[in-house]
Amino acid sequence: MCIRDSLAKYVASQTDVEIIAWKGICMVHDQFNEKEIHDIREKNPGIKIIAHPECPPEVIKASDFAGSTGGMIDYVKNNQPQKVMMVTECSMSDNIQVENPNVEFIRPCNLCPHMKKITLPKILDCLENETGEIIMDKETIEKARIPVERMAAIGR
């Protein structure tokens, strides 16, 4: 398995799987730091801090819960904390608050400029006009086939 460095460290701590990490980060999650977590706790007694596993290990350690986007959504839904900070891309809190109006969200706002490039009009354009095609060589396609098929099978 080959994934980014911070996520690799988290997955390795949760499993017995050997992880081969590549030197990469998520620019949103890597901006968070342990001091910020402690400062938020000082200003907001009783707050629950939930972190995405792509955050640096010290941020995950300082948090109350670490999990995937789905795991974070489930945490809020199932625990209904009075106040929560989601250590992830800031629009995630907006989306989850709609379904959890009784939960107060503290939003450290780190935006992902790449995620913001994906819009419904652009997706519609791709579907209607078949734009944005990605062309790969046969060798790359064959190497990617097995993991892509495994991911698709998980969703079935």
Feature map (PLM): residue ranges:
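Redox- and metal-dependent alpha/beta enzyme cores, enriched for Fe-S-associated oxidoreductases
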Residues: 9-65, 69-79, 92-100, 116-117
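Active-site-adjacent beta-strand anchor residues
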Residues: 52, 86-87
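Short glycine-rich phosphate-binding loop at a beta-alpha junction
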Residues: 48, 84-85
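Conserved small/polar residues in nucleotide/adenosyl-binding loops
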Residues: 1-5
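C-terminal functional extensions of proteins
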Residues: 28, 70-71, 79-81, 87-156
